[in-house]
Swiss-Prot record:
Gene3D superfamilies: L-arginine/glycine Amidinotransferase, Chain A, Protein-arginine deiminase, central domain, Protein-arginine deiminase, N-terminal domain. This is Inactive protein-arginine deiminase type-6. Homodimers. Associates with alpha-tubulin. It comes from Mus musculus (Mouse). The keyword Phosphoprotein applies. The keyword Cytoplasm applies.
Length: 682
């Protein structure tokens, strides 16, 4: 018995055939008809659907169709369900001569229906469904009404530094994190002894996925499809109807990888002669998309704060620890990595997450500037179940912008008629090519673009010494949605707002009050600062010109942000902040540039630790008037009416010394978005 696409009937012996559920067989009615017969009837078992001319026969044993035989006639026969036993279903064709009520002859076709399929979570509801339209499995569609299965990348910290081709044997606990895929065989499997089931993908796709299977009687999971193993011959299923396989991806979408991976199950007929090739009969395919990694904005609720455990930063660490306790957020201390340059924690790392319907995984994206690291201490401090992803960079200079720390994420926004439910990634750079311009390298930038779900916006940040946008902007959450306002505010640094504040204090008679009153002379000198009065600052024309330049740079970004994020002026709060222009500091002489870059003149109040409504703001050490810092007072007056609570972190060296700033000292893991990425349309 074999699978056939077309059959001829016989009046001598019954015809026997295997039929794949859903596939059509062309049945020649005329070829075996007796010469004098002019008409025929056709009927089939309930599991058989018959198309003939404009009629459809289905569902009832006694349904019969009469047809004339004036011209050659064919019928299309299709099984709609698998047969319980061999030859269980049949088609009867009876031939009649003119004026005869009794058939002259009858031909019988015995069919055995077999159903072979790959099942996955096509509808993203946690269920392994058999779609009514099998062709739908071969496509992957975005959107609320979309479909298509999803794979997670294996980002286990234990796999960091291991070759992608290594064969892993997953334990039962870990295997549940993978996407399940079932191979189902329905029907009398005993007749499949001369056939072979093959699970396969392309050689290129095999490099990007791993499929595991635990055979009966074994507790280990065998790697059956993966790197260098694109094909797996399944053993005979015997009486088993369903086998569960577990699938993972080995890499995220990238410029050279769309994120789509197809897995197929094929049925082939074995040849009795070794010289004769096997014959492919049927193939079922499921299309998967690899889940992207998603960054969280500062407006998402915090889960954990990771702090660099350096003695020089102890004041900062203690302050942030207290703030975290106040916010009921766990604090994790990270030891300094001796193999890295001093600015490494948030400068080279970022928390994100990846998600499938059955699992959400928090992970660290690490972009080390030091090549060929032998170990990654950060992975040992992560919460169990977290992932660790390394993406190598190209520009290893100290002042390079080629790291993941050179980006931010906006809250969800709507701009120019399009929704961005997961926000937009903001990437800082030079804005145009130049010999001294600094940018994120093309490979890393396109890697971010390839995730598709947080459409990037490129901003101008090369004017800053660190190049980090968090020195002039920050997003904070609010509950104020009245008057069509958003549930967040964008804070922007504003030198002009600071000068206006100082001018106001000068008019009030406080022109002789100094900045950095509580900072010792040696500490100021080591940080390149000196104690100045309000009047001295206002009278310094060169300093004014430097901040005019900074204001123009920020204004350019403000215009871009309003357009690309759909912001209005009422969504933006100006924070008084001054800058000064200096040459790059703490870099080797061969990396020095004649270009001047902006650096915060006093600790940057935009570099905020956002823990829900609690804000950890760098203490600016501004002019004290009646015992109160006028800069702190101004910022509190702007933010506290929105329900935010301001705590000023007292650690001058942390923010201005060469060891780095708060950007390099802490990273925050946050609650993932409630919105599911597959429901959006990029």
């Amino acid at each position: 018995m074999s699978f056939q696409n077309s059959l001829s009937l016989s009046l001598v012996n019954p015809t026997h055939a295997l039929c794949m559920v859903g596939m059509e067989i062309t049945l020649d009615i005329s070829k075996c008809a007796p010469d004098k017969c002019k008409s025929f009837t056709i009927r089939g078992s309930p599991r058989i659907l018959i198309h003939i001319s404009s009629s459809v026969i289905a569902g009832k044993e006694d349904t019969v169709v009469w047809r004339s035989m004036n011209h050659p006639t064919v019928a299309l026969v299709r099984m709609v369900a698998p047969s319980p036993t061999v030859d269980e279903d049949k088609v009867l064709v009876s031939y009649f001569c003119p004026d005869q009520e009794v058939p002259t002859a009858t031909a019988v076709l015995f069919l055995t229906g077999i159903e072979i399929s790959l099942e996955a979570d096509i509808y993203r509801d946690g269920q392994l469904d058999m779609p009514s339209d099998k062709q739908a499995k071969k496509k992957w569609m975005w959107g609320m009404n979309g479909w298509g299965a999803i794979l997670l990348v294996n980002c286990s910290p234990n796999a960091v530094g291991q070759p992608d081709e290594q064969s892993f044997q997953e334990g039962p606990r870990e295997i549940q994190n993978l996407s399940q895929m079932n191979v189902t065989v329905e029907g009398p499997t005993s007749i499949l002894q001369n056939y072979q089931l093959i699970l396969h993908t392309s050689e290129e796709e095999a490099k990007k996925t791993r499929v595991y299977w635990s055979q009966r009687g074994s507790s280990a999971y065998e790697l059956v499809v993966g790197p260098n193993k694109p094909v797996y011959l399944l053993p005979t299923f015997e009486n088993r109807r369903k086998e569960a396989f577990y699938v993972e991806a080995t890499e995220f979408p990238s410029p050279s990888f769309s994120g789509l991976i197809s897995l197929s199950l094929s049925l082939v007929e074995k040849a009795h002669d070794e010289c004769i090739p096997e014959i492919p009969l049927y193939k079922d395919t499921v299309m998967f998309r690899v889940a992207p990694y998603i960054f969280m904005p500062s407006t998402q609720m915090p889960l954990e704060v990771y702090l660099c455990r350096e003695l020089q930063l102890q004041g900062f660490v203690d302050s942030v620890t207290k703030l975290s306790e106040k916010s009921k957020v766990q604090v994790v201390k990270v030891y300094e990595d001796p193999n890295r340059q001093s600015k490494w924690l948030q400068d080279e790392m970022a928390f994100c997450y990846t998600q499938a319907p059955h699992k959400t995984v928090s992970l660290i994206l690490d972009t080390p500037r030091v090549s060929k690291l032998e170990d990654f201490p950060m992975k040992y401090t992560l919460t169990p179940g977290s992932g660790y992803l390394i993406r190598q960079t190209e520009d290893h200079r100290v002042a390079s912008l080629d790291s993941i720390g050179n980006l931010m994420v906006s809250p969800p926004v709507k701009a120019q008629g399009k929704d961005y439910p997961l926000g937009r990634v903001l990437i800082g750079g030079s804005f145009y090519p130049s010999s001294e311009g600094r940018d994120m390298n093309k490979g890393l930038r396109e890697f971010v673009y390839a995730q598709q779900v947080q459409a990037p916006v490129e901003l101008f940040s090369d004017w800053l010494m660190t190049g980090h946008m968090d020195q002039f902007m920050c997003f904070v959450p609010t509950n104020d949605k009245n008057n069509d306002q958003k549930d967040f505010r964008l804070l922007l640094a504003s030198p002009s707002a600071c000068f206006e504040l100082f001018e106001q204090k000068q008019k009030e008679g406080y022109g002789n009050v100094t900045l950095f009153e509580d900072i010792g002379a040696e500490q100021l000198l080591s940080n390149g600062r000196e104690s100045k009065t309000i009047s001295q600052i206002l009278a310094d024309k060169s300093f004014r010109e430097q901040n005019t330049y900074v204001e123009k740079c920020i204004s350019l970004n403000r215009t871009l942000l309003k357009t690309e994020l759909g912001l209005e002026d009422k969504d933006i709060i100006l924070i008084p902040q001054l800058f000064c222009l200096e040459q790059l500091t703490n870099v080797p002489s061969n990396q020095q540039s004649t270009k001047l870059f902006a650096r915060p003149y006093f600790p940057d109040m935009l570099q905020i630790i956002v823990l829900g409504k609690n804000l950890g703001i760098p203490k600016p050490f501004g002019p004290k008037i009646n015992g109160t810092c006028c800069l702190e007072e101004k910022v509190c007056g702007l933010l506290e009416p929105l329900g935010l609570k301001c705590t000023f972190i007292d650690d001058f060296d942390c923010y201005l010394a060469n060891i780095g700033d708060v950007c390099a000292s802490a990273i925050i893991n946050r609650v993932p978005f409630a919105f599911k990425w597959w429901k959006m349309t990029p």
